[in-house]
Amino acid sequence: MGLFDKHLAYRDAYKAIQDVGANPFKVRFDAVHSPTEGVVDGRPTILLGTNNYLGLTFDEQAIAASVKAVQERGTGTTGSRIANGSFESHVELEQELAKFYGRKHAMVFTTGYQANLGVLSTLVGRGDHLILDADSHASIYDGSRLGHAEVIRFRHNDPEDLAKRLRRLGDAPGERLIVVEGIYSMIGDVAPLKEIAAVKREMGGYLLVDEAHSMGVLGATGRGLAEAAGVEEDVDFIVGTFSKSLGAIGGFCVSDHDDFDVMRVICRPYMFTASLPPAVAASTVTALRRMIEQPELRDRLNRNAKRLYDGLTAMGFLTGPSASPIVAATMPDQERAIAMWNGLLQAGVYLNLALPPATPDSRPLLRASVSAAHTDEQIDAVLKTYGEIGAALGVIEPLKRARA
């Protein structure tokens, strides 16, 4: 019996995927020329699976800030902020985030994953209750495991089921933290946050919204779904990431709670991880300001998302409930999902292949993430390629029948 024997089924499934084409989990970019163009295996490729929603990875001001920071502060911090102190860019980033969200406190983490891991495991523990949307991200589930709170799942995007679960708790002791996402990362659907906030007001507890995929995308100023739904006052904690709209890496949490700052000395994923390199913190501060200065990026992003969503839907692909920057097409079976992904990559379109058990309802899907930087011509080229390969593989007609 070996250490990896428990994973033999995954090993065999992984090998089977690699045996029929490129490895979708180890794609290597020979070059990346822009937010939307790269080279994969020597082929010019449209990038449609990078979560680069506003295209800010190549923003000239963000790049200049990053270069200046690395020249003046070096390549890294070599330790946590607890042990090695904070650089001015860390403090500036937290101040700008607090100002942007209109909150008293902001805390920056080294990754978005660690933000959820740290915040959730610190806020609720044994004897408390963590009420999660069933389709929550892995980082949310992992945070719940680290904190040992009782996990109660409610049906995806179902406020009535949330209320039912809370009623069942009755007068049970312990704090209650409701956790939802702004935009869900697999198929791009949006939480019914106004209704969820109403349940929270009626039944009590705290509400945390993970705005990882909705920051910079939703809301009049880009603050996310809480802003778009008009319920920011009902949201106690907002968690987000810098690796989507802001084109960097890192995570954060903002809150108005007076005691929030104690998190810095009790939150283990914050305390025992090296802090963001100065270059990353500097580029993120600049990208945040650029996002605020350019609301037209959100408009362009939403137009591009609608163009791709409408095109795929019209061809007969089984898309999500509404257009968002994440445009997923559910495939009839895993074999054709893998073949479709390989065909698109060979034709110069890179997007994400998502397979069970990581997908809603255990159905394979192709996941595209649109950018404000995509041109109409690029999206139309993607649609043409999708249609040709989907027809050749017999994907579209079975999906049309399934939709009917």
Swiss-Prot record:
What cofactor is this protein dependent on? pyridoxal 5'-phosphate
User: What EC class does the entry list?
Assistant: transferase
What outcome is recorded for mutants in which this gene has been deleted? Survival of the spt-deficient mutant is much reduced, in comparison with wild type, during stationary phase of growth, especially at elevated temperatures. Mutants are resistant towards the antibiotic polymyxin B. Mutation causes hypersensitivity to antibiotics which affect disparate processes in different cellular compartments.
For this UniProt record, the keywords arranged alphabetically read as follows:
Acyltransferase, Cytoplasm, Lipid metabolism, Pyridoxal phosphate, Transferase
Main location per the UniProt record: cytoplasm
User: What Gene3D superfamilies does this protein's entry cite?
Assistant: Aspartate Aminotransferase, domain 1 (3.90.1150.10), Type I PLP-dependent aspartate aminotransferase-like (Major domain) (3.40.640.10)
PTM N6-(pyridoxal phosphate)lysine: list the residues.
Answer: 244
Return one GO MF term.
pyridoxal phosphate binding
Q: Where found in the cell?
A: Cytoplasm
**Which EC numbers does the record give?**
2.3.1.50
Annotated protein name in UniProt? Serine palmitoyltransferase
